[in-house]
Amino acid sequence: MTLLDPLANALSHITNSERVGKKEVYIKPASKLIGEVLRVMQENGYIGEFEFIDDGRAGIYRVQLIGKINKAGAIKPRFPVKAREYEAWEKRFLPAFEFGILIVSTSQGVMTHKEAIEKGIGGRLIAYVY
């Protein structure tokens, strides 16, 4: 069976593992996009260390959970957002102002919506975490 959205699967796997109190989770298949999203989540303090394990196929990410995630999910479809429009999308996907992050894929890489606002660039919304 094919996996339609590996990013959505990875984020729901992380959320479900956090809810049951697990300390680590294995995410497969691994991809560059999932790795970049995990890096952004780690920089913002939502997960601990993560590492790539090569299994001879697509690979696996081992992620240390620290219990800070209430909800994480992929945004489908991947909406294009201009630099001035982040506040409207923040109201739509996040529960409160300055609580949580939107993860955006831009021409300068994957980053949070706050970093994109500082740099004044738009991009495509790919996920939210709070």
Curated annotation (Swiss-Prot):
SUPFAM superfamilies in the record: Ribosomal protein S8
| GO BP terms | translation
Per the record, the domain of life is: Archaea
Cross-referenced PROSITE patterns, in alphabetical order? RIBOSOMAL_S8
GO terms for MF: rRNA binding; structural constituent of ribosome
Keywords, alphabetical: Ribonucleoprotein, Ribosomal protein, RNA-binding, rRNA-binding
Record GO cellular component, one term: ribosome
| Database matches in PANTHER family | 40S RIBOSOMAL PROTEIN S15A (PTHR11758)
Described purpose of this protein according to its UniProt entry: One of the primary rRNA binding proteins, it binds directly to 16S rRNA central domain where it helps coordinate assembly of the platform of the 30S subunit.
Subunit details: Part of the 30S ribosomal subunit.
- Give the family, as the similarity comment puts it: Belongs to the universal ribosomal protein uS8 family.
Protein's name according to its UniProt entry: Small ribosomal subunit protein uS8
